[in-house]
Swiss-Prot record:
The gene is SSBP1. It is linked to Optic atrophy 13 with retinal and foveal abnormalities: An autosomal dominant disease characterized by visual impairment in association with bilateral optic atrophy. Atrophy of the optic disk indicates a deficiency in the number of nerve fibers which arise in the retina and converge to form the optic disk, optic nerve, optic chiasm and optic tracts. Many OPA13 patients also exhibit retinal pigmentary defects, attenuated retinal vasculature, macular dystrophy, and foveopathy. It holds the Pfam family SSB. The modification Phosphoserine is found at residues 67, 79. It comes from Homo sapiens. This is Single-stranded DNA-binding protein, mitochondrial.
Amino acid sequence: MFRRPVLQVLRQFVRHESETTTSLVLERSLNRVHLLGRVGQDPVLRQVEGKNPVTIFSLATNEMWRSGDSEVYQLGDVSQKTTWHRISVFRPGLRDVAYQYVKKGSRIYLEGKIDYGEYMDKNNVRRQATTIIADNIIFLSDQTKEKE
């Protein structure tokens, strides 16, 4: 019953050696990022002449773990690592909503893709930048309500 649909799906993801030269255009790939964290700064809206405007902000995610050699897992010291992500929002509707409603300290969930690029800094030195391009943002907290 499910054999035929499963084979159809697998054919989309599997490339045979003999098809290498003819099916490169049809090959599927995946670039998805899911982040849950707190906004580190209020967003800024930037527009470079001749390019689409973009809303940019930073997002912190935390990884926590217990360390120690104790057999009782709960007795170890808690360690934490914070990772900062640069978020860019290009989609017109989402870009405007993010600029207006994303605030420093807000807890959000976002989906997007990772992008690696290069730019020239003020000293004309080539730098690499990693950016998360957001496709969807879900607001999990309202900063104004949390402050009350």
